[in-house]
Amino acid sequence: MFLLGRLVPVREALRLLPVPRVHPGFGEPGALLDRGLWDLESGLERDGIADGLRLRPEDVRAIQEFAFATPCFAAADPSRPVRVPRDLVSGPPAGAGGALVADYRDGIGTCPEIARLWSDPLLLTIASRYLRRPAVLKRSRLWWTFSGTQADAADLSTFSVDHFHYDLDDWLCLKFFFYITDVDAEAGPHAFIRGSQARRRLSHQLTLFKGQSEKSLSAFYPPGDFLLLTGPAGYGFAEDPFGFHTGTTPTRRNRLILEVEYGITKRRVAGPYGSPR
């Protein structure tokens, strides 16, 4: 997969199976639709990304309370626990040492509202139909990105901030993101290049580097394909992480975001983050 998984034709061939009929069970729903399911799935197939998902307000509040009450880890380092106070709007918390991000790692499964999403019938339906196979939970993350830090190039690359890249976590993957705080242009919105999961310059497929400069990408993709996703707390979207994407640096307000990732194998995802047990 390390080599072949980078090639668009290989990944597209894996999705030649017909869209399956999915019976995800009767788990308690946590995600809601703000648009028709067919419309969301059509946009996802075409663009590699689609919004129109949201969390219930009471679930957003519960996840926020969990985040304020639970230690997270500066720079995703388990030896650097910190707490984020509820009144902290911008900048890293005390003890974070100016870290750009703080990740909750393995402990998020103790939050019932998060754990419920892992078997959410709507998310499993969308993921299984997009992946053309029963979706397998790969990873789930909850993390802060802080404004007002002086992150160097190494940190930006490590934590995928202002650094367009694609993920290679499985032969096929689908991620769901939910903003747990309000995210506008000044709070580090997620960025995605529309259609880049299926349309890619050959040189971007043959290199061993998953990251590409914005200059290189702008020479191939038109400006209108560079999307910034903003929305209130609870706003959600589905994304094929093989498309080029990045977080952006918050300039005025911190961002708390939840990710749920599905794939097609049980291969564990490498990286400095926790995974569901």
Where are these regions (language model features)?
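Non-heme Fe(II)-dependent double-stranded beta-helix
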Residues: 1-47, 51-161
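Double-stranded beta-helix
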Residues: 183-243
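Active-site rim elements
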Residues: 111-116, 220-225, 247
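Short, structured patches in soluble enzyme cores that scaffold and shape functional sites
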Residues: 141-144, 166, 178-182, 194
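A short secondary-structure junction signal
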Residues: 138-139, 149-157, 175, 186-195, ...
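Non-heme Fe(II)/2-oxoglutarate
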Residues: 3, 7, 14-30, 197-198, ...
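Acidic, His- and aromatic-enriched active-site or binding-groove loops in soluble protein domains
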Residues: 155-173
